[in-house]
């Protein structure tokens, strides 16, 4: 089932998305939720954390999965996906280290893909994948092209992606990323894709 909702602005989109995420967490306290990073989901995560604290929702059984990461950057740098999730999800919710399945950007190779894929499988797979749509159409760091990779892989970044806002503090070119593949994303039981445009905001919810 696919549901496409158009709301009046980014704030309304973020509020609606946070309500949906909270409903998933309430219905399945041990849910495995894959999270995108960057500007699009930022306010959603702020609202979600706020609601969890206000309503005293138990998050001790949750597992979050980092969708992607830049390659060859220390995880502690400000522009990494790791730093983003630590600042906006992990620390505000007081999560344990084992509640985040995360790529280690200093150790990137195909073994890292296998490690993360196996950890997700041991948890029973993804219940929900939160996505943003990149300016060039990428999902995660699956760049548009003729040869899309179904599984977790190391990707060569498109020129536009290399200019991503998160990389402005990198201090050096970043040309590769690691990401869950399109099959990994589609294997999630539900998907929540958020798109913000100059004139409107869209939330696209899919149950596979």
Predicted region positions:
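A glycine-rich beta-strand to alpha-helix segment
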Residues: 36, 40-44, 119-146
């Amino acid at each position: 089932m696919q549901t496409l909702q158009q709301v009046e602005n980014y704030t309304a989109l973020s509020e609606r998305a946070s309500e949906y995420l909270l409903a998933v967490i309430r219905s399945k306290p041990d849910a495995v939720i894959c999270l995108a990073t960057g500007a699009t989901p930022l306010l959603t995560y702020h609202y979600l954390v706020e609601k969890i604290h206000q309503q005293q929702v138990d998050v001790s059984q949750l597992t979050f999965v980092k969708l992607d990461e830049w390659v060859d950057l220390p995880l502690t740098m400000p522009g990494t996906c790791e730093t983003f999730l630590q600042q906006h999800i992990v620390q505000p919710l007081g999560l344990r280290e084992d509640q985040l399945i995360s790529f280690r950007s200093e150790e990137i190779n195909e073994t890292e893909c296998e490690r993360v894929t196996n950890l997700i499988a041991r948890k029973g797979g993804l219940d929900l994948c939160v996505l943003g749509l990149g300016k060039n159409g990428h999902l995660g760091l699956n760049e548009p092209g003729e040869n899309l990779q179904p599984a977790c892989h190391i990707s060569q970044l498109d020129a536009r992606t290399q200019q991503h806002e998160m990389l402005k503090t990198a201090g050096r070119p970043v040309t590769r990323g690691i990401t869950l593949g399109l099959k990994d994303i589609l294997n999630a039981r539900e998907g929540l894709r958020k798109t913000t445009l100059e004139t409107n905001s869209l939330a696209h919810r899919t149950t596979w």
